[in-house]
């Protein structure tokens, strides 16, 4: 079977039409090195088009899933996304405008022959009911796993004599990368519109070995892909891994991952949802440009960094944190937590607030000027209540004019979610006004953030009516 799929990838020519147009977009000295892998990716694109009915069947919802989706859509807040001057949009939007997104795997990846071959095998097995014992990845972790790791680190400064294996950041059309180390100098493109930290982090995530979060084999337990809302020709961008090839290091599904596309990605029209989270309060969190705690934790697991800290000599981290591999006496903490052991409010602006039985106001303003900035400003608040009580947090006035997938320009993160290692619920749309969240404990971290103009958020909070037993 493996040889059969490899032949399929190699016999398809790329001598005309869209394939030639895309290859012609790649310029300069990197063209020769990219040619082979780009051909493989473009051939995969063509095969996926031929597999159209199979891909559509993969995305078809069972009656139970369809019923559940209808119930969720009745309750969800339909967000009208803002058009913001100076914002180039999400990666899939940037690459669509650049004319390359449809042809790259899942919109921004160039694949090796082995990776492309396994994707076709996944589709065959998913649609035929077969299964094979293949090596797992999530982070891409195939039989050549050790060769895909950057064992000596990544050379990210301009020193061409340091190592033969290195990343070369180029300004070609679109935002794209290889997945994992391919040997020698490999390119990562940050073209027009991609010059943002969050986009760069996403593409570096691919280069270091990560696929997209929404392609996890278990994604259907966390999001519903709405096939009818996906634009023509883009269904194959929503294929997923299989249990035989997908390894997630024991981490749960991360809605706030920088490797997750937005809930409106590849939609037929701007405000149609293509990915509906099972927890509807995560709708605006999908598509983040902020590196999540789980992203950091998983990358450290992938590269074995945590082994540097021996448990008996390392910090005893609280709230799900883990010892920093470069300073084992301190912890890397989930969002909303700080200090050496993750048991303090992060330093800087914000405050500790005490909830009572009456509604109290939290108003926060961040930012300056009118332009989009590279770096975020953050403020961290802790809302506390007595032991065994819960906290209610109401959004009174959300930020104005910044409603985009992932709330990647400004917003508020409210951590009423049960697992505090995961990203909290993020909000940035006017439709969020009036929404009330209830915590699972007597502490709610609230993180406000901004990197465009000035935004204000107003919340109210009080002790909830229910008590934790």
Please report, for each region that a protein language model flagged, where it lies by residue.
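Long, disordered, Ser/Thr/Pro-rich
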Residues: 18, 22, 143-145, 267-282, ...
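Metalloprotease/metallohydrolase-associated module, dominated by Zn2+-dependent proteases
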Residues: 219-332, 338-340, 344-347
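Domain-level representation of secreted and single-pass membrane ectodomains enriched
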Residues: 308-469
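Sec-dependent signal peptide recognition
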Residues: 1-7
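Disordered inhibitory propeptide/activation segment of secreted metzincin zinc metalloprotease zymogens
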Residues: 2, 13-161, 270-273
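Metzincin-family zinc-dependent endopeptidase catalytic domain
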Residues: 126-140, 148-149, 159-268, 376, ...
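Divalent metal-coordination and catalytic microenvironments
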Residues: 156, 205, 259, 299, ...
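Acidic, Ser/Thr-rich intrinsically disordered and amphipathic helical segments
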Residues: 5, 68, 199-203, 254, ...
């Amino acid at each position: 079977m493996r040889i059969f799929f490899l032949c399929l990838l190699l016999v398809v020519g790329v001598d005309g039409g869209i394939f030639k147009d895309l290859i012609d977009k790649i310029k300069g000295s990197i063209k020769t090195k990219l040619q082979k892998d780009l051909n493989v990716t473009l051939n995969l694109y063509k095969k996926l088009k031929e597999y159209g009915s199979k891909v559509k069947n993969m995305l078809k919802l069972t009656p139970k899933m369809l019923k559940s989706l209808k119930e969720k859509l009745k309750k969800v807040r339909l967000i009208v996304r803002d058009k913001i001057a100076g914002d180039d949009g999400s990666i899939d939007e940037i690459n669509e405008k650049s004319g390359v997104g449809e042809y790259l795997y899942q919109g921004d990846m160039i694949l090796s022959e082995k990776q492309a071959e396994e994707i076709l095998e996944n589709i065959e097995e998913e649609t035929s009911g077969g299964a094979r014992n293949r090596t797992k990845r999530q982070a891409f972790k195939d039989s050549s796993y050790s060769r895909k790791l950057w064992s000596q680190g990544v050379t990210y400064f301009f020193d061409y004599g340091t190592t033969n294996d290195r990343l070369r950041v180029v300004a070609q059309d679109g935002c794209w990368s290889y997945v994992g180390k391919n040997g020698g100098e490999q390119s990562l493109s940050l073209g027009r519109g991609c010059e943002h930290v969050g986009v760069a982090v996403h593409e570096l995530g691919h280069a270091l070995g990560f696929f997209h979060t929404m392609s996890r084999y278990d994604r259907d337990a966390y999001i519903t892909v709405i096939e009818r809302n996906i634009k023509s020709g883009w269904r194959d961008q929503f294929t997923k891994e299989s249990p035989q090839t997908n390894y997630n290091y024991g981490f749960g599904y991360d809605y706030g991952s920088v490797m997750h596309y937005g809930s409106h990605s590849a939609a037929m029209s701007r405000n149609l949802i293509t990915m509906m989270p099972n927890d509807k309060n995560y709708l605006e969190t999908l598509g983040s440009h902020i590196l999540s705690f789980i992203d950091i934790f998983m990358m450290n697991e992938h590269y074995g960094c945590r082994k540097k800290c021996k448990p008996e000599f390392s910090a005893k981290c609280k709230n799900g944190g883990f010892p920093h591999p470069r300073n084992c006496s301190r912890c890397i903490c989930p969002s909303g937590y700080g200090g050496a052991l993750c048991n303090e409010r992060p330093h800087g602006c914000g405050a500790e607030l005490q909830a009572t039985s009456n509604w109290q106001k939290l108003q926060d303003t961040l930012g300056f000027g009118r332009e989009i900035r590279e770096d975020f400003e953050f403020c961290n608040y802790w809302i506390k209540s007595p032991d065994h009580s819960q906290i209610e947090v109401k959004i009174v006035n959300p930020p104005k004019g910044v409603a985009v997938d992932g709330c990647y320009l400004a917003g508020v993160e409210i951590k009423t979610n049960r697992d505090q290692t995961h990203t909290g619920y993020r909000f940035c749309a006017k439709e969020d006004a009036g929404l009330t969240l209830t915590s699972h404990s007597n502490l709610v971290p609230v993180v406000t953030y901004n990197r465009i103009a000035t935004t204000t958020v107003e919340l109210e909070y009080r002790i909830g009516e229910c008590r934790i037993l």
